[in-house]
Amino acid sequence: MSKIAIIGDGFSALFTALELAKKGEEILVISNQKDEFESGILTPFNTPALARDGAISSSFLGLVSKKSELDIALCLNENFRAWMANFTLKSTKAHDKKMRVLFKKFGQKSFEILRELNEKHPQINFDESGVYLIFSEDESFKKRLDETRVADSEQEILSVDSELANFGLINKNIKGALNLAKNASTDVKELRNALVSELNELGAQFINDEIYELKTQGQAVQKAVGRAGEYEADSFVVASRNLELSSKLGTNLSAILAKFYTIDLVLSEDQIPKKPIILNDMFAKIYPTKNGVTIITNLQVGAIDTLVKTEKINAFLNELKRHLGISELKEPRFRANFVLLSSNDKPAIGRDETYQNLLYNQAYGLNELSFAPHFAGVLADLIKDGKSNEDSDEILLFSSFYEG
């Protein structure tokens, strides 16, 4: 039995801890236990890459029109400039085509894990009935239909009139709708509780501390240094939204922080959508909760801060109101959130090039639950079997370390 320290408490951290605990390893999960937002919408099927043809031009136009999946505010930060250069290179049709195949491949494997977990813990409500994709512009809906293969089992063209009641509060100015039939959703709070419960049963230890440094000797990490103590282990896995630990060691993960807002609304039962909604032309997502919805805005990179900018939220809500069947938003709660975003749509997963007992499981963006459950097992095998990154075809395929 070896001792393994997992730094972070998001789903990439918890699934990695669980896979290692199942293999009989001694697990230490260290995090500052911040209440960070995690998306329960899983869309690995029929979803384009963030870096794709036209992404750059639409992102800069988005600064004016507020209609872009990624708002880019230029800044002089060297890490951002490097990220931006690589993101620009990857924004091609060929990259998008390849990533769609990889999203599907690894999404299926994560779904298998979540399916099994749902059998044991049905309260996580892993629902594979699909996700609505709603269009507010005729042009974008027509373009999507033109790109759709005949008899595509992964997406269903819906009759807006017959489905309207299922859309909940989104019931105006809808030009078209699809059901992305193979995508899914889950209750993230219940999923987290289930994972923590399993880890407790397996003897994992949870420590509330903020790790700010990894101390090394030679080509190995000796200990993780936190505000409240130091923690020794045989292996360390960084699975948080922290870039400082890797940058202090001279490792560039080709990732930056991206900002987005969540807006929580309290609604009556008939106003809650029957399943998650993606608003195609606003690049927003709507996630049903027990007493309302959580709305997830598009991502912002570059010159960002931690503040809640009410003018941005108000502009977003003013546009959203075109689609709402309610005149007043009751008890709205706003929050600024952050995710690590790679420049090539791939997470940073695998061993550090220099420090062989240090591994990363980071930078999934908003897609953590679509892929982290599977890659937790891939990393666990690397640690348990003493393998290198090159021994894993899946890491070579899907890690940002192996794509410029």
What are these regions (language model features)?
Residues 173-227, 231:
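Helical element adjacent to the flavin cofactor pocket in flavoenzyme catalytic cores
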Residues 22-40:
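Glycine-rich FAD pyrophosphate-binding loop
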Residues 1-10:
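Beta1/beta-strand and adjacent pyrophosphate-binding region of the FAD-binding site
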Residues 85-197:
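Rossmann-like flavin
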Residues 150, 155, 326-404:
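C-terminal catalytic lobe of FAD-dependent flavoproteins
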Residues 32, 40-89, 213, 229-353:
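Active-site substrate-recognition segment that forms the wall
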Residues 47-48, 183, 300-303, 359-372:
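Glycine-rich phosphate/pyrophosphate-binding beta-alpha loops
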Residues 13-14:
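N-terminal Rossmann-fold NAD(P) dinucleotide-binding loop
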